[in-house]
């Protein structure tokens, strides 16, 4: 009898835990990368801050928009983009992709670069409670027009709020 009650209790708790990935759920998140957790061909200190918001248009599928700021040595890049995210069978593992436009300026009289990126991301969503999550992920931002100089990859840490 104890096994049956425990099994039923576990089933009910696990169903409620991942209701965050259901259709019509919205989320916002903020992420941070750099500090030695990412690599690009450009030398020097690097840091990236990004804010994103999304909407689950179907169970486990979300569409998102993002804005970000990337600092590498003396250059600053402002990003904006859109993409999709897929959560595997309500277990928290996710994959994402999209398109990102970046405007890079090193200040002064230097040339302004216009870059188009294909971001790829894979990570896991740890829920701290019913709404707040911690989302570590591995990312690759492939640059179409300056591949060798502007492509970067690394680890990203995000905090999300699902409502």
Residue ranges, per PLM feature:
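Aromatic-acidic/polar surface patches that form glycan- and anion
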Residues: 42, 111-113, 148
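Gram-negative (and chloroplast) outer-membrane scaffold detector with strong preference
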Residues: 22, 34, 52-142, 158-163
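N-terminal processing/targeting junctions
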Residues: 14-16, 38, 142
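Cleavable N-terminal export/targeting peptides
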Residues: 1-25
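A short acidic/glycine-rich loop-to-helix N-cap element
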Residues: 143-150
């Amino acid at each position: 009898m104890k096994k049956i009650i425990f099994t039923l209790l576990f089933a009910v708790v696990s169903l409620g835990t991942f209701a965050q990935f259901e259709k019509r759920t919205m989320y916002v998140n903020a992420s941070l990368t750099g500090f030695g957790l990412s690599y690009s061909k450009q030398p020097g200190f690097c840091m990236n801050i990004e804010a994103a918001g999304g909407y689950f248009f179907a169970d486990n599928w979300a569409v998102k928009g993002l804005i970000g700021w990337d600092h590498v040595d003396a250059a600053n890049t402002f990003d904006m983009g859109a993409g999709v995210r897929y959560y595997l069978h309500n277990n928290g593992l996710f994959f994402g992709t999209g398109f990102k436009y970046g405007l890079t300026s090193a200040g002064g009289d230097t040339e302004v670069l216009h870059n188009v990126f294909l971001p790829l991301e894979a990570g896991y969503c740890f829920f701290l409670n019913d709404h707040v999550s911690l989302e570590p992920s591995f990312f690759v931002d492939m640059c179409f027009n300056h591949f060798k100089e502007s492509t970067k990859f690394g680890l990203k840490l995000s905090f999300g709020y699902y409502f």
